[in-house]
């Protein structure tokens, strides 16, 4: 197996359902198989494990039936091909998928990971990987132990973005909150941020942080901010409103609001009608 490197590009694999271990330790294999019809394949676990020479494009594969990609590229040290178009919406097992895949650094941020439950050690020792996967939809009970162990190329910016999404996972092991950054709140976006909070709280939190933690020190106009927001009752007592000049109708018809904001510095406010 280690010396196998024959041309098998013409194989009809349309009926194959299991390709697990297919090129496991085929260290010489690097043939073009990108045109294979893999639409029936359900398991690709260990498929290219330790296939150290393999670096052929397979980004056009139809992977919609695949449920298992565990250890798929583990130790495939040469592999660095685009995979972002793969449909992995049925995949539950991604554990060790890119472990020891030392060259891999492709954008996979658009993957639909809603079925994934096992992601432990997925990028362990993926020494080149530096991508933002913060848009992934991961279940709170998913296993992510060691997911990013020994990923020295992962930037602090990407760590922060990933942490925003992954920190809600029960066993998320990384304390990357120090790398988290949010879009600054200014007069230009304050009302947009408030509106987004009510229409899509998760997105607002991802973009601006939780509303209670917003840095509003640059905002001068908060007029009508919570006008008619009858359900609003978040604790915004920590807001810095020292620059605000206009608070007119800020809480108009915000009938549920009942938080203590008595310590606000309103010395710059000119209008509170």
How should each PLM-predicted stretch be described?
Residues 1-273:
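Negatively charged
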